[in-house]
């Protein structure tokens, strides 16, 4: 391997896909969360048979399972994808009711290892915590009797998200129209949450904000609003995971691809190379590609392009 090739790899921080010989081309790799350049995969899945008002959604990291929370059934539905990351191959497996805690469930978030999930809704203004004895299997789920009240900041919470290590919680709702930030003194335990006195307003982007999601590094945040539902809004954070440093930097308009009148939930998978959102008006999950390609190196000249 040549010295210039190694320097290229270090500079871009990504290992090459392949090497084609001394006179060939090295392709460095791909980058996810390229939301502004997102393209519809022409793939979707209708949840109508189980849930006619889908809101929060989550995807297992390996792309083989989908989870949908909605207020039609007040439960979390589990689906298997026979082809990883291909939403059109989903089939229903089981469900777990959250109706004892929530009558209007909205937001859903799964811990990255699949042993816990969290739900928020407008009926109680609380974030509820659940555990699964078998990871990613909602038939083994149970309520942990752990919750966190957010009504001092938001009385109509719709969306929630966590920092990847479980030490930060974020809640977005329709009343304050802001993303609120909390610290968990014990990671992934919502009963230990406290408000950071930090928030970020999205009111200028819509009056009915419903969803908040972060990229894996906390340097970008994505929101949706029910009254401007065709848009996925992009926000850049100059300090990772600190929403007080956020600013609106772009959008993805999905109106040319789907009739997005009521986006209810949003989630990324495959290192941010796939994006999915739920559509309440027609009970459907849509799939997008959100990937960009890095530079390639001409091995004969050392030129990148």
Language-model features: locations:
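Polar, enzyme-active/binding microenvironments
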Residues: 2-305
């Amino acid at each position: 391997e040549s010295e210039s090739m190694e320097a290229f790899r270090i500079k871009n921080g990504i290992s090459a896909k392949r090497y084609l010989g001394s006179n060939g081309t090295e392709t460095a790799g791909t980058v996810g969360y390229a939301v502004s350049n997102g393209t519809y995969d022409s793939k979707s899945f209708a949840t109508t048979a189980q849930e006619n008002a889908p809101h929060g959604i989550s995807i297992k990291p390996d792309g083989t399972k989908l989870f949908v929370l909605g207020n039609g059934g007040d439960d979390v539905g589990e689906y298997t994808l026979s082809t990883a990351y291909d939403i059109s191959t989903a089939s229903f497996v089981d469900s777990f009711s959250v109706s004892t805690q929530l009558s209007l469930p909205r937001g859903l978030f799964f811990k990255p290892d699949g042993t816990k999930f969290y739900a928020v809704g407008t009926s109680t203004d609380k974030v509820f915590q659940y555990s699964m004895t078998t990871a990613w299997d909602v038939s083994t789920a149970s309520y942990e009797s752990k919750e966190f009240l957010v009504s001092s900041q938001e009385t109509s919470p719709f969306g929630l998200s966590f920092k990847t290590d479980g030490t930060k919680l974020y809640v977005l709702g329709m009343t304050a129209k802001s993303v609120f930030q909390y610290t968990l003194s014990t990671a992934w335990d919502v009963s230990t949450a406290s408000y950071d006195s930090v928030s970020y307003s999205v009111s200028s982007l819509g009056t009915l904000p419903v969803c908040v999601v972060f990229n894996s590094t906390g340097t970008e945040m994505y929101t949706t609003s029910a009254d401007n539902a065709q848009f996925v809004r992009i926000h850049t954070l100059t300090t990772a995971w600190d929403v007080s440093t956020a600013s609106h930097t772009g959008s993805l308009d999905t109106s040319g691809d789907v009739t997005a009148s009521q986006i209810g939930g949003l989630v990324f998978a495959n290192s941010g190379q796939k994006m999915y959102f739920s559509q309440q008006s027609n009970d459907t999950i849509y799939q997008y590609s959100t990937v960009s390609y890095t530079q390639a190196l001409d091995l004969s000249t050392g030129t990148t392009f």
